[in-house]
């Protein structure tokens, strides 16, 4: 909000500089950790209200839910229990930075561990050259495909969000074996095919299909086979179905592996969502 407020004449003295303004209210939670990235958190001596109050009387916020007919939304979590072997390899990767995938031993660097852990919950890992190595099976991907198969069998269409290319390839292979029709953003007619009911499943990455697309005519059920770290991508991707013109209640199904980084990832995402909702509510007052 700093950029918008500064553009219309707010913030004075040292707060005219974004970096100074940020340093006033926030601190880098990753400072001293050796990480190459930053994670800014609100200082405990401040609240969101302290940021909003100086400009609140000049703010006007519109929430689409306040003036559009938005369908009811239900969020459903699927907490998948991995097999003992999968959990053993996951913990080996987490603590010892290497993993055995169907006889192939792979090592990872500490700074890449978090992303690698998420791929490991799906039963595969990328090496340093970007080559994917799979385990013999993936309980989580099997559960996702089983859910899709059941829903399609009941006449539903599924908008499936994935996080990794190998994850999408593996799911696509399984859908083919089940004779479930699908397409992706690589198909020039994917929007038309989806909205016309020509395919059972539309597979999308939230970074490539999460903004601006009108997909509400094609179905009302979304599946996250792997969740995103980005709140913006989460909200925008879900909004492809949660929008005016959707004539059925929307279901958002989130698949995550129990006792893994995905549980913390989902919790962090929901916390971000809560903070943003509180922030927007303050700007309405």
Predicted regions and their residues:
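Signature of the SF2 helicase/ATPase Hel1-core->accessory helical subdomain module
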Residues: 1-30, 227, 232, 243
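Long, largely alpha-helical accessory region at the distal end of helicase-like NTP-driven motors
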Residues: 280-285
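Conserved RecA-like helicase motor-core motifs
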Residues: 13-16, 156-159, 172, 176-190
């Amino acid at each position: 909000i700093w950029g918008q407020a500064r553009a219309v004449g707010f913030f004075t003295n040292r707060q005219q500089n974004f970096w100074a303004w940020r340093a006033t209210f926030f601190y880098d939670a990753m400072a001293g950790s050796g990480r190459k990235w930053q994670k800014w958190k609100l200082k405990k001596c401040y609240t969101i209200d302290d940021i909003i109050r100086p400009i609140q009387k000049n703010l006007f916020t519109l929430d689409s839910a306040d003036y559009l007919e938005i369908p009811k939304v239900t969020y459903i979590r699927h907490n998948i229990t991995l097999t003992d072997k999968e959990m053993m390899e996951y913990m080996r990767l987490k603590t010892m930075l290497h993993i055995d995938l169907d006889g192939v031993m792979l090592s990872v660097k500490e700074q890449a561990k978090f992303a690698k852990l998420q791929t490991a919950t799906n039963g595969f890992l990328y090496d340093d050259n970007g080559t994917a190595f799979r385990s013999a099976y993936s309980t989580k991907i099997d559960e996702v495909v089983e859910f899709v198969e059941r829903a399609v069998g009941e006449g539903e269409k599924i908008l499936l969000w994935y996080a990794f290319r190998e994850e999408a390839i593996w799911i696509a292979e399984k859908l083919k074996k089940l004779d479930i029709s699908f397409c992706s953003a690589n198909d020039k007619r994917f929007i038309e095919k989806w909205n016309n009911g020509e395919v059972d499943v539309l597979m999308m990455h939230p970074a490539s299909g999460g903004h601006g697309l009108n997909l509400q005519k094609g179905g009302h059920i979304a599946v996250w086979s792997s969740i995103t770290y980005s709140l913006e991508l989460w909200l925008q991707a879900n909004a492809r179905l949660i929008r005016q013109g959707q004539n059925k209640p929307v279901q958002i199904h989130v698949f995550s592996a129990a006792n893994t980084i995905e549980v913390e990832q989902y919790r962090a995402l929901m916390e971000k969502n809560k903070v943003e909702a509180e922030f927007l509510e303050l700007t309405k007052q």
